[in-house]
Regions:
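Secondary-structure edge/capping motif, primarily at the C-terminal ends of alpha-helices
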Residues: 91-98, 117, 121, 156-160, ...
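Bacterial N-terminal signal peptides that target proteins for export
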Residues: 1-8
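Sec/Tat signal peptide C-region and signal peptidase I cleavage site
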Residues: 18-22
Length: 270
């Protein structure tokens, strides 16, 4: 049985983005109408739709959510993979903020990080296109290019047999996306906004992937261990199977945990 649930930016790391128009944003959240993509037995809405719902629920200050520093890679492959995920997530946030200079900076950083994990060739064209489309302020096209860059990176990593690292890219993007979602919702709380966090199946999915890591050294990596603990701590807050409402206090707790983890990923060794 397939599961459908809401989530900011998860599709960024797991599925293709569908460009959409602001006037198409619904007045309230109807998950059954979200364009979605399937990962194994999990169906997720595309990020543009979730962003538009947030815009409809309030007026997020996207520029305030963009990180000034993208972080520094340590050369440690797990950290670089997680960092790459956060940087690509940052790209979508910068697009929502319509910050052309930040988008171009992120495009360059994606290329640099891809080089560290030996998949630079997979994103050279995308990086150039991100810069060109950002200069033209063609935000829909930039969204598509960021999603394409992620898919190219993941595909190249899997071709190299780096399946576990590819999952870490996904998790890095999800963690950063969840940090931003909880930040926005906590500043203008509503039950509809908080409902975007209800995602027990995804937490189980990521936990299974971490538990299935075969490389002992990777499985014991400090950041991987930290993320495993974070998922376990978040599950009772956003993984309620009974559909219980997620309170503003829970949203703030999730934000604190994801923010600390993003900080560990982006500043480790910096």
């Amino acid at each position: 049985m397939r599961k459908t649930f809401p989530l900011l930016l998860t599709a960024l790391v797991l599925a293709a983005t569908t460009p959409c128009r602001a006037q198409d944003a619904p007045a309230s959240i109807d998950l059954s109408k979200f364009p979605a993509a399937e990962v194994e037995d999990i169906v997720v809405p595309v990020p543009s739709e979730v962003f538009l719902v947030l815009d409809k629920l309030g007026t997020p200050n996207w520029r305030a959510e963009v990180r000034k520093s993208l972080g520094k890679n340590t050369g440690n492959r797990p950290q670089v993979a997680l960092l790459l995920g956060t940087v690509i997530a940052e790209g979508f946030i910068a697009v929502e903020a319509e910050d052309a200079e930040k988008v171009k900076e992120i495009g360059r950083e994606v290329l640099a990080l891809a080089g560290v994990i030996n998949v630079r060739k997979a994103v050279i064209t995308r990086s150039k296109s991100i810069t060109e489309k950002a200069e033209a302020k063609n935000w829909k096209a930039v969204r598509v290019e960021f999603d394409g860059a992620l898919q190219d990176v993941r595909g190249a990593m899997e071709e190299l047999g780096d399946y576990d690292l590819a999952q870490l890219v996904s998790m890095g993007g999800w963690i950063r996306g969840t940090e931003v979602l909880t930040s926005i919702v906590s500043k203008n709380y509503s039950q509809d906004g908080a409902e975007l966090l209800h995602q027990p199946e995804l937490l189980d999915y990521f936990t299974r992937k971490l538990d299935a890591i075969k490389n002992t050294r990777l499985g014991k990596d400090e950041l991987v261990v930290r993320i495993r603990k974070m998922l376990a701590a978040i599950k009772p807050l956003i993984g309620k199977e009974d559909g219980s409402k997620i309170s503003i206090d829970q949203v703030k707790k999730i934000n604190a945990m994801t923010s600390e983890t993003v900080g560990a990923i982006t500043s480790k060794g910096a």
